[in-house]
Regions:
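Metal-dependent nuclease catalytic regions and adjoining charged, substrate-binding loops involved
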Residues: 1, 134, 138-142, 153-227
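Active-site ExK catalytic segment of metal-dependent nucleases
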Residues: 99-101, 110-116, 125-137, 146, ...
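Secondary-structure transition/capping motifs at alpha-helix termini
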Residues: 119-124, 156-160
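Extended, structured, electrostatic nucleic-acid-contact surfaces
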Residues: 217-245
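N-terminal accessory regions of nucleic-acid-interacting proteins
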Residues: 240-310
Length: 310
């Protein structure tokens, strides 16, 4: 996401981040106004990106050998220059266009490859279909959403929706998908995202742990918020379901939970589990207030743990 003065420019990647976590999109929006800092990429992430770039370049060479009439859109140019170059290349009918760039209002994005097909369009007896490389061998719905976005943007130039779109996985296998089967979902999600961005000031949104956290560039910012608020999710080994149940009883911080009378908690949580979490919350509160680490010895249960060792 790019924010310039009062304008917000979004991409298919931003759309995927929004689907994964609304708060990611909110942090993207507030990055500069609130001085938020992105998490530095780990060595694993750097390696993953390098493999992704190599995978893309590998297929660029393969496709260039197959389609000699090809062109690369210069990614260092301005958005408008890239878009105009893409339109020009499409109208000239290049068989392969690498890094085609699309603009529809404030929605814009760059496709890995678009390849000429024999489908009739406003251009004549041809149109284009999207091919996008992914280093992963296990494709996800977000990957399909991304190529659907590019296919939609192509239709704004050609006047016709591409029939197919392709994902090239880490095994170099091609996965075709019918654009028409995913278009409505894409439009719904895009509309929802745009509505979200238009009224973020009126929304009461708080970061929650989710599957996206481990890959999120804003993870450190959320951690700072949780630590500052002493949020209930800081209790070790507590899960999302348990958090939601405790919050319904007003127990939204570690301190409130630690001070709560277990007998008055009506949440449907296994008794032993609730007692363990409560004990853990008290230990963490002790550490937070005194700076000293305390430990409780857990009662031994015959037949479990070290008792199972020969």
């Amino acid at each position: 996401m790019r924010v310039k003065k009062d304008q917000i420019f979004i991409s298919p990647s931003d759309l995927n981040n929004f689907v994964s976590c609304n708060y990611h999109a909110l942090n993207d929006l507030n990055e500069h106004s609130k001085g938020l800092k992105k998490k530095e990429p780990s060595e694993d992430m750097k390696l993953w990106r390098r493999y992704g770039d190599e995978h893309e370049k590998k297929h660029l060479n393969i496709l260039k050998d197959k389609y000699s009439n090809n062109i690369t859109i210069d990614p260092t140019k301005s958005d408008d220059e890239r878009f105009n170059s893409t339109i020009d290349a499409i109208k000239k009918g290049y068989d392969l266009i690498y890094k085609a760039y699309f603009i529809e209002g404030k929605f814009r994005g760059e496709a890995d490859f678009i390849i000429k097909t024999k489908q009739k369009s406003d251009l004549g007896d041809y149109s284009y279909e999207v091919y996008d490389t992914k280093i992963t061998k296990n494709l996800k719905p977000k990957h399909v959403l991304q190529v659907t976005a590019y296919s939609y943007l192509i239709s704004k130039i050609t006047g016709v929706l591409p029939k197919q779109m392709y994902l090239i996985d880490g095994n170099s296998e091609y996965h075709p998908n019918k654009v028409s089967e995913f278009l409505d979902y894409f439009k719904f999600t895009k509309s929802k995202f745009e509505s979200f961005l238009s009224d973020t000031k009126d929304q009461s949104l708080y970061p929650e742990t989710c599957n996206h956290c481990n890959y999120c560039i804003w993870q450190d910012e959320c951690l700072k918020t949780w630590e500052a608020d002493n949020y209930i999710n800081q209790v070790a080994r507590i899960n999302k379901s348990q958090i939601n149940k405790l919050k319904k009883e007003g127990l939204d911080t570690v301190e409130k939970f630690a001070n709560a009378d277990l007998k008055k908690i009506k949440a449907k949580i296994n008794k032993a589990t609730l007692e363990r979490l409560h004990q853990q919350a008290n230990l963490q509160e002790e550490k937070r207030k005194t700076g000293e680490s305390k430990c409780d010895v857990i009662d031994q249960i015959p037949g479990q743990g070290f008792y199972k060792m020969p």
